[in-house]
Amino acid sequence: DGVKLCDVPSGTWSGHCGSSSKCSQQCKDREHFAYGGACHYQFPSVKCFCKRQC
């Protein structure tokens, strides 16, 4: 069975998220999320979310 991942808002990203690769790298480097992250829309803007095991 695969690992179930949940998105949590990045604690270090500020403002609009325009690059999922940069978001993912920041999640790994600054917040120590092994699975990285991605940009997702959450009203009212696109934000960086990091992925972790649920």
Swiss-Prot record:
Domain of life: Eukaryota
Disulfide bonds: 6-54, 17-39, 23-48, 27-50
Function: Possesses antifungal activity insensitive to inorganic cations. Causes germ tubes and hyphae to swell and form multiple hyphal buds. Binds to the plasma membrane of the fungus. Has no inhibitory effect on insect gut alpha-amylase.
Protein name, per record: Defensin-like protein 1
Family statement: Belongs to the DEFL family.
UniProt-listed GO biological process terms: defense response to fungus; killing of cells of another organism
Keywords from the named record: Antimicrobial, Disulfide bond, Fungicide, Plant defense, Secreted
GO cellular component: extracellular region
Primary location group: secreted
Species classification: Eukaryota, Viridiplantae, Streptophyta, Embryophyta, Tracheophyta
InterPro entries documented for this protein: Defensin_plant (IPR008176), Scorpion_toxin-like (IPR003614), Scorpion_toxin-like_sf (IPR036574)
Family matches, as Pfam families: Gamma-thionin
Record localization: Secreted
